[in-house]
């Protein structure tokens, strides 16, 4: 077939070369954005008198038809037409005649594809924000049900201090809230229009870029045409934000995997989110959590891939930029899928409160409570720390825990110890007392939950 740009050429490329250079296999995902951008563009052309109202109306009717066909997956794309832009233009001309060729007046594929991707990411980022808010709501529900569920808190994967399971869950709520904030902030930079920048230098036609931007729901336009067609910062920022979100999901999944193991038994995954073994009949594997953890590397790879593409590109457009889309599409699909799986997995998991409670009575995570007890009676904390360290050593040598140590032994270590010490050693009491702002104390958790509910419910409307 003859190319829409073929006037300069005397030879046709081999089929395998065309296939290598074509992007229609993946950029067809931009079909609705491409058509909507074209409708706005031709509307502006008519307003400015660059095409007649009759021509614009005919073009818009043709584009609306193609948009409806696209929604029903009835469009047949061809490699020969290279990309989504030329495929749509070719179909339009075939449907309405040569007047369809006027659509591209005052526009280049360079600003056209940039516009498509801005429209695409604007929609997808809003979808991801909503899905993240839905996951946050699930976290709030689990936290509400586990305010007084006591578990070990960890540092270095060693039991450190008793905490509320709700407090642990809410830590991920606030990580996700930062992710939401980053996505929301990125919309400022996504929601600007490159349309009308042309190939790189603008156009000689008297276009109205602000008008077409307004028609597409953009808040403004790029101030520099070179920047407009070569900028991919908005995609990189999306990939970076998504990498951080996936990192948070991966960290949580790592804990879910550990907690569901026989060594911990803190939770049990629903059968819906686990699989078995082809050889070992007893196995219940946390495959969905493992997949989310694994897919995090995939999103990181998409970020570093585009950073590497961009690092050596001179202004303005280069064909290298064709490599900006597949990683973007893949990241959107991956993040959306992981968020939905994560929400279902957490919502349906069973919390083994008894096992968590046993864990904090069979360790030394209450040692800090004794040090604080001595410090509250006027002993310098460093001296208190030394005394408690010796107590822990004594216990490990005897094969007992701090609650098992008789008061006489405590008094041998320090005369400040009294009978009320044993109240301090209770994991429940230890958690309750940590009532500083942002701490694991029950009053603080109630406050945190109220704030978290407002942030989650405000968006998803429950």
Curated annotation (Swiss-Prot):
Sorted UniProt keywords: Amino-acid biosynthesis, Arginine biosynthesis, Cytoplasm, Lyase
Pathway where this protein functions: Amino-acid biosynthesis; L-arginine biosynthesis; L-arginine from L-ornithine and carbamoyl phosphate: step 3/3
UniProt keyword annotation of Cytoplasm present: yes
Catalysed reaction equations from the record: 2-(N(omega)-L-arginino)succinate = fumarate + L-arginine
Coiled-coil blocks: none
GO biological process, one term: L-arginine biosynthetic process
Similarity-based family: Belongs to the lyase 1 family. Argininosuccinate lyase subfamily.
Name of the molecule in the record: Argininosuccinate lyase
Gene expressing this chain: argH
